[in-house]
Amino acid sequence: EKLYVVLKKLYNCSNSQYPTLVFYEFHKADARAVVDGTGEKETAWEVILNGFCKAGFAVNAVWPMRNAPYMRNADGTRALIVARKVSKTEQITRRGFIQVLKRELPQKLDRLLSAGVDDWDKEIACMGSGLSIFTRYQKIVNADGSYTSIHDALQLIYQEIKEYFDRIAAEQSEDHTILEE
């Protein structure tokens, strides 16, 4: 709740013409808890994203930051959350959201990865691309009339990102097979 108060104050003093930047320490364990559904409570990642959404921000990107030496066994990645003050009025169904993800996310990921993101940072950077789609809507309505939680949205985004990378791996495997023949 305190984080929401801070983010709401930040929203109120933000200008929609300029992005709002917030540094955050993203932990891979948070991502695993969301993907696996193993978390019994909200992860820190979900809490901060909920705060951004509730305050009214749209997340434009999440950029990994290299301001410390790379440590192979480190669980965390420093990240810059780039958000913008917007007036969100549009709602979409969960099915519609999934269709938008399937249509727009691959193009966003193609652009992102062409910039040369490190393997270590791909997860968080790709997540930012998915969040830019999720946070453009005021609400995402489930079939039963309830609203999609940030937890569920993150799972859907991770699923689409995984499918994207699986597709790339399959294409590369086919290319390699053709070259060998």
Where is each model-derived feature located?
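S-adenosyl-L-methionine-dependent nucleic acid methyltransferase catalytic domains
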Residues: 1-181
